[in-house]
UniProtKB/Swiss-Prot annotation:
It is found in: Secreted. Its main location: secreted. It comes from Dictyostelium discoideum (Social amoeba). This is Uncharacterized protein DDB_G0275255. One of its GO terms (cellular component) is extracellular region.
Length: 289
């Protein structure tokens, strides 16, 4: 009886998760696409410079004139050559400028690849990940659902292996790990290959905007002499838990960030008021200095 109930619970979750990641919970016409761009020159409009390719399929690519993005996104990181780093969820529609001979793309969600991933392999596919509810006393534990985007197919895996902690200095591993497995819309898309229960990610695509929620406003504390305001940083890169901390002895070394990343710091409670440094992707919103 208990075994059958667990099987029913797992099956129900699985069906829900496949529906969620396929985009059919929004509109049946919504699919995930990789974007490409070429700076072609045309003598007569319209002049579509973008193409989209439906993920995990062999369908023919489509030419796109314009993208219609949701409000609140920094479009300078999304258009032109930058668009080659995007995955978009949405649907095509007739162009507002040339309805009879051009196509626009109405974007529901947009994801951008983290710089300095690994070179993609011929076996890589695109996945999103969920928790299947399995709990184990030993590891590895097969508790991760890897759902193939645009395809009603999935695999159960035990490990998500990211390349970025090796490739990028001072990356916030808590921030990245929090995006691997989510129950909301804000999880990452992983391009990778599954073997023996492990997916080796070549590139991760981050949901935009990031963070997806507004950081909380913090009170301004009055600290006694010899103390200063310090913080922690949560999985959304927001400063939290302000407190007065006695000054510590700080090192003077300041790290350099890899290309595509910017240096940020904050007075850390963990480091007794000394600055804690991270290298955040340049395309995410700043949450502090």
């Amino acid at each position: 009886m208990i075994k059958n109930y667990k099987l029913l619970l797992f099956t129900t979750f699985t069906l829900f998760f496949i529906t969620f990641v396929s985009g059919s919970s929004i509109l049946k016409a919504n699919f995930y696409y990789k974007v490409d761009w070429e700076n072609v020159q045309c003598f007569v409009p319209p002049c579509p410079k973008y193409t989209i390719q439906k993920l995990n399929t062999n369908e023919k690519s489509q030419k796109i004139l314009d993208f219609i993005f949701p409000n609140g996104l920094n479009k300078t990181t999304l258009l032109g050559d930058e668009s080659k780093t995007l995955i978009v969820l949405g649907t095509t529609q007739p162009s507002s400028k040339f309805p009879n001979n051009a196509t626009d793309f109405l974007v529901t969600r947009v994801y951008k690849s983290l710089p300095l991933g690994n070179k993609q392999t011929s076996t890589d596919k695109y996945y999103m990940f969920g928790d299947n509810g399995t709990r184990c006393k030993t590891s590895p534990c097969p508790n991760i659902v890897a759902a193939l985007l645009n395809v009603h197919s999935q695999e159960i895996i035990n490990t998500i292996s990211q390349p970025y902690e090796k490739n990028v200095g001072f990356l916030d591993s808590v921030w990245l790990s929090s995006k691997n497995i989510r129950s909301d819309d804000f999880g990452l898309i992983g391009q990778g290959t599954i073997k023996n229960g492990v997916i080796s990610i070549s590139n991760s695509f981050i949901y935009l905007p990031d963070p997806p929620i507004k950081c909380p406003e913090l009170p301004l504390l009055k600290c006694v002499e010899g103390n200063s305001m310090t913080y922690s940083r949560d999985e959304n890169r927001c400063l939290v838990s302000p407190r007065c901390t006695k000054f510590g002895v700080c090192t003077l070394s300041i790290p350099l960030c890899n290309k595509g990343y910017r240096l940020v710091s904050f007075p850390s409670t963990e480091l007794n008021g000394c600055p804690k440094f991270f290298c955040d992707p340049e395309f995410v919103n700043k949450t502090h200095k």
